[in-house]
């Protein structure tokens, strides 16, 4: 039986110690996945104005982080990704020809240029970086289920702490169901 690998592609200011990635990563660890954290250091450019610059810089840093990871004998590969990390992870899977299950937290529109249909996505409707209607259309075209959280920002949070906690639980239930183990 091959190994199980989970690669975590964070966002720029949303690191793996924040709720969406923290709990999903803990879940993967509890199920025997080897965790590989992609780190970018300081990325050049700002979202959304310089998205291509940020994406290209993050892409190059992710390639460097993953150059020693051997996916060839993996029985299952899961990519957890957030924001710009969703675009980087989708491109990595596409260009490396990997069979990956993707969990996209707050994907950007650029993500859908590379994404395949093997994924699930979560989005806050008050996300200032993404047009909800356009993301919905792009996800539908790729057959990627998109769960929308009314009023949630780019972290899928609001000022209401209890709403945030209940939303984290709902998101976790959905990705646990998607992973099906």
Describe the residue ranges of each PLM region.
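Serine-hydrolase catalytic machinery in alpha/beta-hydrolase-like enzymes
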Residues: 3-73
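Active-site nucleophile loop of the alpha/beta-hydrolase fold
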Residues: 11-12, 40, 103-112, 124
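Acidic beta-to-alpha connecting loop that harbors the catalytic carboxylate
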Residues: 12, 125-128, 150-153
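A conserved short beta-strand
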Residues: 96-109, 118
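Short, proline-enriched alpha-helix->beta-strand connector loops that line the catalytic pocket
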Residues: 114-119, 142-144
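Short beta-strand/loop motif that positions the catalytic acidic residue
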Residues: 121-123, 127, 135
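Catalytic histidine-centered segment of alpha/beta-hydrolase-like enzymes
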Residues: 152-167
């Amino acid at each position: 039986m091959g190994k199980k690998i989970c690669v975590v592609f964070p966002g720029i200011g949303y690191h793996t110690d924040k709720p969406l990635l923290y709990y999903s990563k803990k879940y993967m660890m509890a199920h025997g996945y080897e965790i590989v954290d992609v780190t970018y250091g300081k990325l050049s450019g700002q979202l959304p104005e310089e998205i291509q610059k940020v994406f290209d810089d993050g892409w190059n840093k992710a390639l460097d982080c993953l150059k020693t990871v051997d996916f060839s004998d993996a029985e299952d590969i899961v990519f957890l990704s957030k924001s710009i990390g969703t675009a980087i992870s989708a491109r990595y899977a596409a260009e490396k020809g990997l069979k990956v299950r993707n969990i996209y937290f707050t994907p950007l529109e650029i993500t859908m240029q590379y994404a395949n249909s093997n994924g699930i996505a979560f989005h806050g409707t008050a996300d200032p970086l993404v047009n909800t209607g356009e993301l919905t259309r792009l996800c539908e075209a790729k057959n990627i289920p998109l769960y929308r959280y009314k009023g949630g920002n780019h972290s899928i949070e609001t000022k209401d702490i209890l709403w945030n906690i209940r939303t984290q639980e709902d998101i976790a239930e959905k990705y646990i169901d998607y992973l099906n183990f």
